[in-house]
């Protein structure tokens, strides 16, 4: 379990995540890099779920981005189709949160590609806590915090509540057209 959060505000899109990997109720590693810059640093992506499964999906998604010349939505849809229909891929248990300068998406193993409302994505066990915090910072308080600070503060809140989330954060940022 983990917490991955993406926020798009003030001309930036940010994805951040914690670094904890667990096996059952045991922490196996505390510094897993679950957020990465991919496709010529034009796309950022984070994963929740099985680590090995997610790394496999990262590789497949990168191949789709190469094949479709960085078209995020098309690449996501093609990955979701493969993920849903391929016998081996269907067994992979992970979610991907991906973003480029125009779009933010969640890709699921059931073949769903979801574009979030309000450009906030939260996945993983601590996702609801981080999402609530991000909404509070971005919408309720109408803050002037940078996107990266909203993500960091929201992940800190989630890590204080969710036992499967730690404070070893990886945060990636790219420019947004929105």
Swiss-Prot record:
Q: Which domain of life is it from?
A: Bacteria
How is this protein's activity kept under control? Allosterically activated by HslU binding.
| Molecular function (Gene Ontology), one example | threonine-type endopeptidase activity
Catalytic activity reads:
ATP-dependent cleavage of peptide bonds with broad specificity
Q: Which GO terms describe its biological process?
A: proteolysis involved in protein catabolic process
> SUPFAM superfamilies recorded for this chain?
N-terminal nucleophile aminohydrolases (Ntn hydrolases)
Identify the keywords attached in UniProt to this record, alphabetized: Allosteric enzyme, Cytoplasm, Hydrolase, Metal-binding, Protease, Sodium, Threonine protease
InterPro entries noted in UniProt: ATP-dep_Prtase_HsIV_su (IPR022281), Ntn_hydrolases_N (IPR029055), Proteasome_sua/b (IPR001353), Proteasome_suB-type (IPR023333)
**Any single GO CC term annotated in Swiss-Prot or TrEMBL for this entry:** HslUV protease complex
**Which residues are catalytic?**
2
Compartments where located: Cytoplasm
Q: Which Gene3D superfamilies match?
A: Glutamine Phosphoribosylpyrophosphate, subunit 1, domain 1 (3.60.20.10)
EC number(s) reported in the record: 3.4.25.2
Q: Which Pfam families match?
A: Proteasome (PF00227)
List the transmembrane segments: none
Coiled-coil portions: none
Name the enzyme group at the top EC level: hydrolase
Q: What does this protein do?
A: Protease subunit of a proteasome-like degradation complex believed to be a general protein degrading machinery.
**HAMAP family named in the record:** HslV (MF_00248)
* Family according to the record: Belongs to the peptidase T1B family. HslV subfamily.
- Oligomeric form and interacting partners: A double ring-shaped homohexamer of HslV is capped on each side by a ring-shaped HslU homohexamer. The assembly of the HslU/HslV complex is dependent on binding of ATP.
**Protein name, please?**
ATP-dependent protease subunit HslV
